[in-house]
Amino acid sequence: MDDKRRLILDQALALVDERGLAAMSMRAVAERVGLTSMALYPYVGGKDALLDGLVDLLHLELGTSVGDDLAEFGWRERLRALGRAVRSLAHAHPSAFPLLLNRSAAGASASWLTAALRGILHDAGVPASAIPRLARMICAFLLGYTTGEVTGGLPRVPPDPESAPDPASEAADAAAREAEFDADLADLITLVAHAAPHPADDRT
């Protein structure tokens, strides 16, 4: 990615992190990088293209966070690590993250997550004909669950209306959410294993 384009996208993402997606405009981003709005166009195009660029940047960040270190691990651990990386990305960029669900085909790196999932499913021994469907299903869960989590769209246990906010209760809720997500990942791993006629060993 061009250095100037990367700088602009980094600043656009920082703006969204600080002030929300509604605050992002060409003018606001231009001010952060010391340019005019028109000067952004050669690097990121218009606002729609800028949003696509944010999707690209988020996928790049996800790929970097997972890295190549998992290549030596089995498919189960790789799927678990990928799921947790998606969730960490959602919590790091809660305002921008829903773009991955709403603009899933955008950006030059937008196929990274699907490609990573397909590689894991292949290594698990899933038949080639079943890989696209399973990859879409797992991708939909990872992006849908985490988007709901950071936007407040997931159902949660209602607090006692007569109780004051309890930080300990909030921490417990966060821990329960994490445990639920890990349990869901375990269920997905079991589903993948059942989809493979001869499931690969963890070290495969």
At which residue positions do the language-model features occur?
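Actinobacteria-biased recognition of intrinsically disordered, low-complexity terminal regions
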Residues: 1-7, 13, 68, 197-204
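Hydrophobic alpha-helical connector segments
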Residues: 64-103, 109, 128, 138
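C-terminal peripheral helix-coil segments that are non-catalytic and often amphipathic
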Residues: 123, 151-204
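Short hydrophobic clusters on alpha-helical segments that form packing/core surfaces
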Residues: 8-16, 54, 58, 86, ...
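Helix-turn-helix
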Residues: 7, 11, 15-49, 53
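Alpha-helical DNA-contacting segments of helix-turn-helix folds
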Residues: 16, 51-58, 104, 109, ...
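A contiguous pocket-lining binding segment that forms or flanks enzyme active sites
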Residues: 113-146
